[in-house]
Amino acid sequence: MKAVVLAVALVFLTGSQAWHVWQQDEPQSRWDKVKDFATVYVDAVKDSGRDYVSQFESSSLGKQLNLNLLENWDTLGTTVGQLQERLGPLTRDFWDNLEKETDWLRQEMNKDLEEVKQNVQPYLDEFQKKWNEDVELYRQRVAPLGAELHESARQKLQELQGKLSPVAEEFRDRMRTHVDALRTQLAPHSDKLRESLAQRLAELKSNPTLNEYHTRAKTHLNTFGEKARPALEDLRHTLIPILDTLKTKVKSVIDKARETLTAQ
């Protein structure tokens, strides 16, 4: 029940992104999210791609062309894996530097959110209390009706529905009243949070350190590019022979087909 109340408050305030403020566990870092997504995506592409290549080579056309695509695919997969291993530390270092540079802003935003959380907590507690009271009242009023249905289900089904409908409507109306009251109570805090966020953004734009941060971010990107260049060059050198081999074999097949057509 408490999770429901918190979820309602989050919808009224800042949306699902504010959920981390109420979570006890630390949210997953940006680098971990990027790394996990990239790993899953690349693995899926490698697995599905290899299946397609294998199916093609097993076909009559694939056997006739004899391009050795599966062998080249495995070589490419190994090279990509090595590239991931070499770029992994560089990428993590880039994100670490970026997080350090923006840590002060994140701390200020967390302070604002924590202040709003403390201010709205009494309203959430009151909302939860009323919610529990109405749920218990509804349960007490419905329980006897359930007993009647159990005693003579077929005979009293229509009568039970007639008794239950007003109770359900009353419960629904009471819940709507509580939700509307909570929305009204939280509205000023929601406005305050939006104003605070707008103020932080304005301070960020006028802050002299913004240009310094931009320079640092550019430096980090340049450093990352310089360190990643050797690994990308290795990948390019690995791909060139594979592409040249495929090009030669395809050209040979086309030439043979042209000779066959000319002879006919």
Swiss-Prot record:
GO terms for cellular component: chylomicron; endocytic vesicle; extracellular vesicle; low-density lipoprotein particle; spherical high-density lipoprotein particle; very-low-density lipoprotein particle. The modification Methionine sulfoxide is found at M109. Residues 1-18 form the signal peptide. The keyword Thylakoid does not apply. Its main location: secreted. Residues 67-264 are annotated as: 10 X approximate tandem repeats. Keywords: Cholesterol metabolism, Glycoprotein, HDL, Lipid metabolism, Lipid transport, Lipoprotein, Oxidation, Palmitate, Phosphoprotein, Repeat, Secreted, Signal, Steroid metabolism, Sterol metabolism, Transport. One of its GO terms (biological process) is blood vessel endothelial cell migration. Sequence repeats lie at residues 67-88, 89-110, 111-121, 122-143, 144-165, 166-187, 188-207, 208-229, 230-240, 241-264. It is found in: Secreted. One of its GO terms (molecular function) is cholesterol binding. Gene3D superfamilies: 1.20.5.20, 6.10.140.380, Apolipoprotein. Pfam families: Apolipoprotein (PF01442). InterPro entries: ApoA_E, Apolipoprotein_A1/A4/E. Glycosylated. Palmitoylated. The keyword Lipid metabolism applies. Belongs to the apolipoprotein A1/A4/E family. Homodimer. Interacts with APOA1BP and CLU. Component of a sperm activating protein complex (SPAP), consisting of APOA1, an immunoglobulin heavy chain, an immunoglobulin light chain and albumin. Interacts with NDRG1. Interacts with SCGB3A2. Interacts with NAXE and YJEFN3. Participates in the reverse transport of cholesterol from tissues to the liver for excretion by promoting cholesterol efflux from tissues and by acting as a cofactor for the lecithin cholesterol acyltransferase (LCAT). As part of the SPAP complex, activates spermatozoa motility. This is Apolipoprotein A-I. It comes from Mus pahari (Gairdner's shrew-mouse). The gene is Apoa1.
